[in-house]
Amino acid sequence: MNTLLMHCRPGFEGEVCAEIAEHAATLEIPGYAKSKPASAHVEFVCQDADGAERLMRRLRFADLIFPRQWARGPGFIELPESQRIEVLLAELASYPVCGSLWLEVLDTNAGKEVSTFCRKFEKPLRAALVKAGRLQEDPALPRLLLTFRSGREVFVGLAEPRNSALWPMGIPRLKFPREAPSRSTLKLEEAWHQFIPRSEWDKRLAPDMLAVDLGAAPGGWTWQLVNREMRVTAVDNGPMAENLMYSGLVDHQKVDGYQYRPRQRVDWMVCDIVEKPARTGALIETWIGEGLCREAVVNLKLPMKQRYAEVRKILQRLRESFDARGLKVAIGCKQLYHDREEVTCHLRRLER
């Protein structure tokens, strides 16, 4: 199992290659990354047979920015037109018994076509794996991840459930709320799923908390905050959706989001303004560093070519700034499924 397969947003293969190559070099695990443009996946081929397993053991998947999902295996294998299950059972003879099964496809148009095959194939495959003793429901065992590039080509991979994506392919199935004024609302909801354990939502996303939404109009992110019954200051020169204003929980301030400062410390600051990432990074530094908020979810827009390098530079600058202030801040950064040319950062001040 010398190959690490990583899913990603189409067009961001280069960022995944740069990110995993840097980590592998730091960990002294030799190998090389390979990908094709807009293929929505990257393979990192390790020189050592156990290289992919060592990478997964030494890295926290949650700390990776651009990969949506990962799995280790020997690479893609060919399947015949018939007797696919028999071939897979033979391939799995050297694998450990697995505790769960996910059939995955790539986030491409071809992948959408393959998903129909996967839905039909999963039930008989699952039954065959259970009968052969290769699959038993146990969250402590590795997860079997079968990534189909077509009905005839599959990556037979493994990953630990606690150190891989929360959802198949890293894609959450969130329902767009009809009352929300824009689809951007799903970005904030996904961020909460990604960065906050569900068991902590009632405590950290509680009613009557104070929140500020910078660049709020028309209110996609504000809607999520109001839905949690928070009191929100929506900062934007543009108009807000009427249903949000009627809630009685929103104070609309028509000022520049980068200039606004709250009169008192708030629980949450969220920001989805289209601006250069360095300027937004400085905004994060001010709000968290000066204690204007306890937690923040902020999007960094990435129109430039060296996108991974830019994100890494901003995150490093934030860490150095907080260290210099003597602050303990948890920082997470991920390109979410609902993100486009951007990444989402989550920051939380931790009391020393």
Curated annotation (Swiss-Prot):
One of its GO terms (biological process) is methylation. It is found in: Cytoplasm. One of its GO terms (cellular component) is cytoplasm. One of its GO terms (molecular function) is S-adenosylmethionine-dependent methyltransferase activity. It comes from the Bacteria. It is an enzyme of class 2 (transferase). The active site is at K301. InterPro entries: RlmM_FDX (IPR040739), RlmM_THUMP-like (IPR048646), RNA_MeTrfase_FtsJ_dom (IPR002877), rRNA_MeTrfase_M (IPR011224), SAM-dependent_MTases_sf (IPR029063). SUPFAM superfamilies: S-adenosyl-L-methionine-dependent methyltransferases. Coiled coil: none annotated. The keyword rRNA processing applies. S-adenosyl-L-methionine binds at S184, A217, P218, G219, G220, D236, D256, D272. Monomer. Catalyzes the 2'-O-methylation at nucleotide C2498 in 23S rRNA. This is Ribosomal RNA large subunit methyltransferase M. The gene is rlmM.
